[in-house]
């Protein structure tokens, strides 16, 4: 295996390191550093999959590592926001519930392309960044309402997909 084949997983691993760094810098009011860490994490999130596909080194392990690093980063960022009083603690339960729903409906054998999961993850990353760039209460309320709408859409989409799949299997 060439050294280049490790690049995507190294980029993904950066998010595991970024999570506690963000937590520390945010809670210590080092917002510029926190934003820089978030931007770096978002860049690695975009690049890891792109580079893996370009180098033809995609793997199930890489896909799971990517989803897990996203989840860790998102939960840690929102935990910091909850500690600061920016969001209600229930947001963490919502995020964890949606992740568990994703895992339960995606299957544990092989990662699948899940557009709603991608949209939700992308929105959560955007929500983290917008929350720190525009920390006004009304902005966070709007972001939270949109998150609830996305989560409801995701749950309904999964419900109808599973129901339709069962109907097709019974034919």
Predicted regions and their residues:
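A feature for the membrane-embedded catalytic helix bundles of lipid/isoprenoid biosynthetic enzymes
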Residues: 2, 67-171
């Amino acid at each position: 295996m060439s050294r280049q084949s490790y690049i995507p997983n190294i980029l993904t691993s950066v998010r595991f390191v970024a999570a506690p760094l963000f937590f520390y810098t945010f809670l210590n009011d080092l917002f510029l550093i926190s934003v820089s860490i978030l931007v770096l994490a978002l860049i690695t999130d975009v690049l890891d999959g792109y580079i893996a596909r370009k180098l033809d080194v995609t793997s199930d392990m890489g896909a799971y590592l990517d989803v897990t690093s996203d989840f860790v980063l998102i939960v840690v960022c929102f935990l910091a926001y909850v500690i600061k009083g920016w969001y209600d603690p229930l947001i963490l339960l919502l995020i964890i519930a949606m992740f568990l729903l994703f895992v339960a409906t995606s299957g544990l054998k092989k990662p699948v392309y899940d557009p709603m999961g991608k949209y939700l993850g992308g929105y959560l990353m955007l929500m983290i960044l917008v929350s720190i760039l525009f920390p006004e209460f009304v902005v966070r309320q709007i972001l939270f309402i949109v998150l609830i709408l996305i989560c409801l859409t995701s749950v309904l989409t999964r419900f109808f997909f599973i129901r339709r799949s069962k109907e097709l299997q019974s034919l």
